[in-house]
Amino acid sequence: MLGFAIALALPFTLFALFPSWLKSMPKSGGWMNVIKVTLGFLELAFALKFLSVADLAYGWRILDRETFLALWIVLFALLGFYLLGKIKFPHDDDDTKVSVPRFFLALASLAFAVYMVPGLWGAPLKAVSAFAPPMQTQDFNLYNNEVHAKFDDYDAGMKYAREHGKPVMLDFTGYGCVNCRKMELAVWTDMKVADLINNDYVLITLYVDNKTRLPEPVKVMENGTERTLRTVGDKWSYLQRVKFGANAQPFYVLIDNEGKPLNKSYSYDEDIDKYVDFLQAGLNNYNKKK
């Protein structure tokens, strides 16, 4: 939302500071309509992103990853053809000439659409990982190097870890967390990282913005104030704050079978070597406690 606000306010701010710039602007005409249509396509693309966050949080499953990508591919392909003059709208000029900047913008839009096509079969698409739904919503996936959580419930995951004698990796995340998606596709897809998480840890992913209602509201005390936990996300957010003193995502913490941290927590940092060291240090500390 901050990005939208800045983008809309910046032109007015600049023209207010430098009124003479208005004189150098070309008169309104077809070029203005092209800008409006282009921004309209971009607005639709970002609207789908925000809709996907709500879709995930409430569990509607309307916009799975491949559905989202298919819609984005269509939007950016249409934008590319529009900029090339192949598609006309009612208020567009009849001029068939395409300027050089407009041509390169069309080329970029079409290239972006083509880039996303492999994502329909499960390709990571790191460039759009911050916007697309998580990989686990993909129904058809030819790629098998992704990391998927064994549990999305803390108690069930801890019970499994105790029974199998493995340390636990808690992943506090959110459906609307951009940096979480970046970490999952930029770091977790590394073979060393994926091998450590899949084979040596029990991964429990807890979504702090999960809107699923709890069977019964739970009243808790936090900092001397009574709070009511009404959703699953409220429960995991409360757990993160009270047990680990943090409220940001992504937030990774390695714990033993008693729920005690094995080393320092880890937040957003796409350095793969650091992440491997973080996982290996936790595993070493767990083995020392045995």
Language model features with spans:
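Composition- and surface-driven signal marking solvent-exposed, interaction-prone regions
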Residues: M1-L2, W60-E66, D95-S99, A127-S129, ...
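Short active-site neighborhood of thiol/selenol oxidoreductases, capturing the structured segment around
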Residues: E163-R181
